[in-house]
Amino acid sequence: MTQVTVKELAQEVEAPVERLLQQMREAGLPHTDAGQVVTDNEKQTLLTHLKSSHKSKAEEPRKITLQRKTTSTLRVAGSKSISVEVRKKKVFVQRSPEEIQAEQKRELEERRAAENAARDKVEAEVRQRNEEQARRQAAGSTAAAPAPAAKPEPAPAAAPVAAPAPVVADAPASEDAAARAAERKKDETRRNESRTRDDDRRRGEAPRVSIKVKVKEKEKAPTPRAAPRTTDEESDGARRGRGGKSKLKKRNQHGFQNPTGPVIRDVTIGETITVSELANQMSVKGAEVVKFMFKMGTPVTINQVLDQETAQLIAEELGHKVTLVSDTALEDSLAESLKFEGQTESRAPVVTVMGHVDHGKTSLLDYIRRAKVAAGEAGGITQHIGAYHVETDRGMVTFLDTPGHAAFTQMRARGAKATDIVILVVAADDGVMPQTREAVQHAKAAGVPLVVAVNKIDKPGADLDRIRNELSVEGVTSEDWGGDTPFVKVSAKMGTGVDELLEAVLLQAEILELTATPTAPGRGVVVESRLDKGRGPVATILVQDGTLRQGDMVLCGSNYGRVRAMLDENGKPVKEAGPSIPVEILGLDGTPEAGDELSVVADEKKAREVALFRQGKYREVKLARAHAGKLENIFETMGQEEKKTLNIVLKTDVRGSLEALQGSLGGLGNDEVQVRVIGGGVGGITESDANLALASNAVLFGFNVRADAGARKIVEQEGLDMRYYNVIYDIIEDVKKALTGMLGSDVRENILGVAEVRDVFRSPKFGAIAGCMVIEGTVYRNRPIRVLRDDVVIFEGELESLRRFKDDASEVRSGMECGIGVKSYNDVKVGDKIEVFEKVQVARTL
C-alpha cells in the first residue's frame, strides 16, 4: 500500500497545506505536520467529512429569482405601432420542512380557535334570543289573561279592570323594543356568518357550523318585522336571479330547429365551377364532395375546376336541383340589346394584300395610293398592318397591308378574317415561297376569294407559267386553266397592270354583293393598337357595319371607353366613320388586342360590366391553360436538368408587332436553352420596365421605341443591356446568337495517330517501353493516349516518353519506328495499339 504524506496529498488535490491540515483537524484526525503519513482509511474519513459539510451547506435555504420579459406590439391609428414590454420578477425561497410543519400547525390552531369562538358566540346569541322570546311570550300571556275575566264582572267594579290596563298598554311597546333588538342581533349574526364564510372560503373548508346555525335561525326566529323583509329579499332575489335569468334565457333562445329531412338546394352551375364553389351552393363541406368523387373513382382537390356535366352529375346524385347557365349569358344579353335595324346599302370592299416578304406588296399598294408609304417603314419592310381607304375612278376600296415576314402569322390570319378579298402578290422572278403558301391557307380558311397579282413582271427571268404551276399545287387555279382565280400581271415600279388589278377586285366585290346598314350603331374590328405617350391608348378600327361617331360609348374586347376623337389614315380628325372605313380612335381605358370586336353600346354601366367579366374570364382561361400545361409536362420534365433561360423585357410601338415578336422569340431555343418574355407592352421603355429587367436579370429590347430619362438612368447605373431595333430580323438574329453562346461548347476528340507495338523493352527510369511502328497519322509527346488490345480499350492515360533511337522526339510520323513510354502503365504487350488523340472544344449551334 502506497503511503502519502500530507504535503503530497495537498499537491495532489491542489490545495494549500495549512487548509488541508485544518480540514483534517475538523474531521478529527491527529495530523499536525506536513510530513506525517496519511493512510487510506484516514483519506476516507477526510472525504466523508468534506462531503457531509458540503451537503449541509447545499441544504441551506436558497433564494431563486425568476425574471420574465414579454414583448408585444400595440397598433395605433395609421401605420404606427408601439412596442410594449412587460417585466415580471418572482422570488422563490426554499424553506426547511420543520418551518413548513410549524406554520401549518400554527394555522390549524388559529383556525380551530376562530371556529370555537364563532361557535360560542353564535350559541350565546341564539340562547339570548330564545330567552328574550320566552320572556316576550310570558309577558303576552300575562297581558291577555285579565281580558276574558272582565266580561262577567259588573260595571261598577272598576278597580280590577284598571289594574291590568297599564300592562296591556305597555305590551306593544315592549314588543317593538324586542323586535328592534332581535333585528339588530340578526344583522350582527348575519355579518359574523359572512365573515366566517369568507374565512372558510379562504382556508378552503366548508362552513359547516354556519349552515346549521342558519337553518336553525330560519326555523326558530320568524320575527314579525324580519319576515316581510326576508320575503322581499327572497322574491327580489328570485326576480333578479332565478326568475329574471329564466326569462332572459327564453328571450335569447333562437327559433332554429334541425331539419327533419334532407334540404334540397337550387344549384346554379356555369360552364366551369370549382369543387369548393359547388360545395358552398349545396351547403355541404368541401371534403364531402371530394369524398363523394373519390367513391366515383375521380380523385380531385378542393380547388380543382370541374366541367358542367361532372358538376351536374354530382349535384343530382346528392339530391339537389340543378340549373345550368352559360358563361356567355352576359355577352349574349348585350348582343340582343344591340339593334341593327335600317335600310341596307352596298359598301366598299375591304381588300387585304398578302404575300412573301419583299415581293412588292407595299410598293403595289403605294402605287395605287399615289403616296410613298414604304419609305417610312424600316428597310422597306412592313412592320405592322396599315389600313387605308382609296378613292379610285371605279369606286372606293379599303386596303389592309399585312407584313410578309414569318413572324406575323397571327397578323395575316386576322387580316384574312377582317377582309372581303385577298390580293396575293407573287414575285415573278422568285415564285411561290413559304409565306405565299401560308397566305393561301389563311384565305381558304376564311373563305375569302383570291386575286393573284404577279408582280415584278418587268424584270428579266419572269416566268408566269411557273407561278401558275406552283400555285395550282396549292389549289389556286388560274382562269386561263379553267379555274376561278384571276391572275393579273403587274409591275409596282412601272404601274403596269394596276388598272386591270383594280377591275378584277371590283368585279369580285360585285359578285359578293357586299352590304351594310349605315344607320345602325357602329360595329367593327381592331386592326392595330398602340400606346401613344401624349394621347394614351390608340386603336385602329375597321368599321364593318353601322356608323361609328365621336362620343359613342364602345366596348372593345376587355376594354371600354368613350370615343373622344377619331382620325383618318392621314391623321385628320373626323366626326364619324361609315362601313369599310378605317379610323383611329382615342378614349379607351387600355390597348385592346388586335382582332378584338368593337361594338357601340348605349349604357356605360353595361360596357364596364361586360369588360370586367371578359377580363376575369381571360384570366381564368390563362390559369387553366397554365395548370393543364404543368400537368401534361410533369412526367416529361421529371429527371431533366433545368433549362438555361434568356429573360427579355420587350416593348414595341404597336400591339401586332409585340404579338409577332413574342411568338417568334418563344419558338427559339431547344431542350437546353429557352427564351422567356417576362414583360411586354406597347409604348416607350419606362423606369418600371428597367426595374423589372434589373430584378429578373433580363435584357431590354425596344422595337421602334425609346427609353425615357428615368429608365436610361437606371440602365447606366446598373449596367443593364438595352438594345434598340427597327427591323425584326435583327432582333431574331441577336437572340439566336445569345442562345448559341448560352449553349456552351462540345468537346470533340480527334485521333492524331495510331502506333502498333512490335516489341517491349525494360527501362530502369520509365519501366516498360513499347517499341512501336506508327501506322497512321502522327504520334505526339505529352498527349492523351489509349491502349487497345484486340480493338478493346484497356487503358487510358498520357504518353510520357517518346524517343527515336536514343534521342527524345516531340513527334513521330507515319511509317517510322519509335519507343513509347506510357505513364503509370507497364502491362504493354506485343500486338497492342497505342492511339494518340486530342480534345477540341467546338461551339454548339441551335
UniProtKB/Swiss-Prot annotation:
GO MF term set: GTP binding; GTPase activity; translation initiation factor activity
Composition bias, Low complexity: 136-148, 158-176
Compositional bias (Basic and acidic residues): 96-135, 177-206, 230-239
Region (G3): 401-404
Primary location class: cytoplasm
Any Pfam family: EF-G_D2
Annotated GTP binding sites: 355-362, 401-405, 455-458
Start and end residues of each stretch annotated as Disordered: 94-263
Keywords, sorted A to Z: Cytoplasm, GTP-binding, Initiation factor, Nucleotide-binding, Protein biosynthesis
Chain positions covered by the region annotation G5: 491-493
Residue span(s) of domain tr-type G: 346-513
Sequence ranges of Basic residues compositional bias: 240-253
Chain residue ranges for the region called G1: 355-362
Alphabetical list of SUPFAM superfamilies matching this protein: Initiation factor IF2/eIF5b, domain 3, P-loop containing nucleoside triphosphate hydrolases, Putative DNA-binding domain, Translation proteins
Coiled-coil positions: none
Localization (cell): Cytoplasm
Cellular compartments per GO CC: cytosol
Alphabetized InterPro entries for the sequence: DNA-bd_dom_put_sf, EF-G-like_DII, IF2_assoc_dom_bac, IF2_II, IF2_N, P-loop_NTPase, Small_GTP-bd, T_Tr_GTP-bd_dom
Annotated family: Belongs to the TRAFAC class translation factor GTPase superfamily. Classic translation factor GTPase family. IF-2 subfamily.
Task performed by this protein: One of the essential components for the initiation of protein synthesis. Protects formylmethionyl-tRNA from spontaneous hydrolysis and promotes its binding to the 30S ribosomal subunits. Also involved in the hydrolysis of GTP during the formation of the 70S ribosomal complex.
HAMAP family named among the record's database cross-references: IF_2_B
Name by which UniProt lists this protein: Translation initiation factor IF-2
High-level lineage: Bacteria, Pseudomonadati, Pseudomonadota, Gammaproteobacteria, Pseudomonadales
